[in-house]
């Protein structure tokens, strides 16, 4: 992002494939080294800024070592909405100057992402609220926004996707994880499932605020989260994955 702010966009983009390949090599090494102790899944977070990102994501996901990817939206009208107040203001202006319209545009782009990528996990569903004027607002009172939220949740449910209970929101000062309570309750009413995420960008952030995240889910009436379990496979083939539920009462024992 710093490279983008300096205008050196091309240099920023050119290094990404190299970093991704290095990540896969290291992930495979760790997966093999620790196979007797822990099952390591290999995945990536797929950015969706516009439609022409689709082919790139699908190509990356085809690698046999990749188990899954997270589909996320961090930009609206090509402008970051979670980086700082200045970028958020630019995105707001690009949407016409009103937050309600910016939220609508965010969820429309998210809908495009869902249709194009069908991600197994949807990242930080309501990231748009992070830098908004009122992150705790009841978005169900914005008719157009709420229609789009429900539309997207229904699509994720039909696709068999999961939402993150993403505790990075707590680390960044919000009162609730992503998604917020009104959205989480709507998702639960559709039979939706949650997986746990710290959205860590470094070792120090691993499992940050998981105890609070578990309490949040329990307050919603959720009693389990979901993960994926790999099955034995040949090295040149993708692993078969099975859904596995983890009771919160057991999960909490690791974060008391």
Please provide the spans of the model-predicted regions.
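Active-site-proximal loop/short-helix segments
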Residues: 1-3, 79, 83, 121-136
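Histidine/acidic residue-rich metal-binding segments in metalloenzymes
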Residues: 19-20, 24-32, 39-41, 56-65, ...
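Hydrophobic faces of well-ordered beta-strands that scaffold small-molecule active sites
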Residues: 40-44, 69-71, 121-123, 163-165, ...
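Catalytic metal-binding/acid-base residues of hydrolase active sites
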Residues: 45-48, 74-76, 126-128, 168-170, ...
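Short, basic, glycine/proline-bearing loop/turn elements
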Residues: 38-45, 91-96, 137, 165-171
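A metal-dependent hydrolase metal-coordination microenvironment
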Residues: 1-86, 205
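Charged catalytic cores and adjacent phosphate/nucleic-acid-binding surfaces used
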Residues: 130, 135-256
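Surface-exposed cleft-lining segments at the edges of enzyme active sites
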Residues: 85-103, 129-142
């Amino acid at each position: 992002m710093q490279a983008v702010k300096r205008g050196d966009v091309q240099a920023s983009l050119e290094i990404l494939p190299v970093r991704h390949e290095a990540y896969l090599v290291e992930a495979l090494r760790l997966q093999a080294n620790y196979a007797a102790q822990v099952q390591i899944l290999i995945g990536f977070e797929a950015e969706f800024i516009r439609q022409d990102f689709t082919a790139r994501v699908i190509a990356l996901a085809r690698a046999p070592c990749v188990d899954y990817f997270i589909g996320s939206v961090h930009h609206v009208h090509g402008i970051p909405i979670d980086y700082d107040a200045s970028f958020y203001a630019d995105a707001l202006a690009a949407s016409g100057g009103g937050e309600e319209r910016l939220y609508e545009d965010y969820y429309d782009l998210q809908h495009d992402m869902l249709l194009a990528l069908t991600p197994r996990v949807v990242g930080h569903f309501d990231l748009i609220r992070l830098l908004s004027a009122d992150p705790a607002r009841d978005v169900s009172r914005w008719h157009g926004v709420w229609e789009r939220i429900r539309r997207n949740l229904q699509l994720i449910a039909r696709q068999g996707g999961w939402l993150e209970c993403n505790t990075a929101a707590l680390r960044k000062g919000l009162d609730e994880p992503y998604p917020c309570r009104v959205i989480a309750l709507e998702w639960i009413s559709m039979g939706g499932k949650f997986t746990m995420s710290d959205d860590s960008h470094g070792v120090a952030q691993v499992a940050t605020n998981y105890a609070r995240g578990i309490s949040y889910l329990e307050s919603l009436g959720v009693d389990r989260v979901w993960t994926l379990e790999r099955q034995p496979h040949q090295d040149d083939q993708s692993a078969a994955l099975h859904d596995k539920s983890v009771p919160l009462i057991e999960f909490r024992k690791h974060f008391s």
